[in-house]
Amino acid sequence: MKFQLDPKIKELTKKYVAPPNAKDSFIKDIKATFESDRYSLDDDERLLHSHGQHSTDEVYKVLYNRLDSFTDLVFYVETHDEVCLLIELAKKHDVCLIPYGGGTNVTNALKPPRDEKRMVVTVDTRRMNQIEEIDKENLMVTVQSGITGKDLEGALNKEGFTVGHEPDSHEFSTVGGWISTNAAGMKKHRYGNIEDIVQNVTMVTPNGIVNQKQALTRSSIGIKAQNVMFGSEGNLGIITRATLKIHEKPEISSYESIIFK
């Protein structure tokens, strides 16, 4: 079998990004409330935050100028309080917010709707990446929602612990993303899925702050209010904090690989 290494269609180095649908009153309040490094109207930043990793179709559209919708502004939150302030301003000015973690979403949840008439702001949570507490006695860790799996696991390993949650996107995806997509991991048979690991979640919504206790186990008995944040895909609010179960790191780790010739 021979492969064509020289594609007929060349990648476009200069990607087209539609002009932002910026709402002047919202921008004015943003500038008056936050530091200038919290927000960006830059075309490259907007392009980066206007898609996830849904399929090869989405990759093709990014490479060859086929994206048909773009976020209008990217906002980088750093604290829970900043999320609260941003949501209040969005309510005041009727602005649409799209939460963004590691950018690995595969359900088109990061793509701005084509028919959305309001200004769209993508809220990047990756600066909210701190571990607030490692409770070694009760085997729990409390983190901000923007920490990646790689950084969380690395910090816990140094203390002799592990979360044990490893989705394929582990290196880039965030704890908030795990919860909002109801993620499963490669070690789920040992440590469980994300709803088995999470002990508490804090979400900021347009109507206030929700603190959700441990989710219920999986079953088919109708809608369960305790599980409403899991798999919500950013539709209900922005997750800012979570408490997860941790486990002692195994004393021995062994790895095997199979090579096909």
Label each PLM-derived region with a short phrase.
Residues 94-96, 162:
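Residue-level detector of anion-binding/catalytic polar loops
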Residues 1-88, 106-139:
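N-terminal flexible segment immediately upstream of the FAD-binding catalytic core
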Residues 129-261:
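FAD-binding subdomain of flavoenzyme oxidoreductases
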Residues 89-92, 232:
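Alpha-helix C-terminal capping segments
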Residues 100:
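Conserved PLP cofactor-binding pocket of PLP-dependent enzymes
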